């Protein structure tokens, strides 16, 4: 197993049944009414930043861009955590957000 492999792909390969159930949960959450898809992705970015998860930030930045979020919206969702999670979380995740936004 390569160390640069996507961690979520590793999870899916090692635990396919559990990953399938997790994907069902994610789909159920995505289908919730009340928030548009872009807002949901921006919230996910903020949550991943609060959790200090650059890999998650990168993934959700790419997903947010695909559904119409601007670079400014993506980076703002990260920086919004400054007073809540601190400078370290923002500095750790901002580069990942920018990198994820550049992905296709």
Per-region residue spans from a language model:
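Residues at alpha-helix boundaries and short interhelical turns
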Residues: 33, 50-54, 68, 85-88
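Mid-chain, well-packed structural core segment of small domains
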Residues: 52-79
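Amphipathic, charged-and-aliphatic alpha-helical interface segments
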Residues: 40-54
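Acidic, glycine/proline-rich low-complexity segments that act as flexible tails and inter-domain linkers
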Residues: 1-39, 65, 90-104
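Buried hydrophobic packing segments
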Residues: 46-47, 60, 78, 97
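C-terminal structural segments of small proteins and small subunits
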Residues: 72-100
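Alpha-helix C-capping/helix-to-loop hinge sites
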Residues: 25-32, 46-50, 81-84
């Amino acid at each position: 197993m390569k160390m640069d492999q996507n961690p979520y792909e590793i999870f899916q390969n090692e635990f396919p049944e559990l990953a399938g159930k997790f994907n069902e949960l994610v789909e159920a959450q995505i289908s919730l009414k009340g928030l548009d898809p872009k807002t949901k992705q921006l919230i996910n970015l903020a949550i991943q930043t609060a959790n200090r998860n650059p890999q998650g930030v990168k993934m959700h930045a790419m997903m947010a861009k695909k559904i119409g979020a601007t670079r400014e919206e993506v980076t703002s969702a990260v920086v919004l955590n400054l007073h809540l999670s601190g400078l370290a979380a923002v500095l750790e995740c901002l580069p990942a957000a920018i990198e994820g936004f550049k992905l296709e």
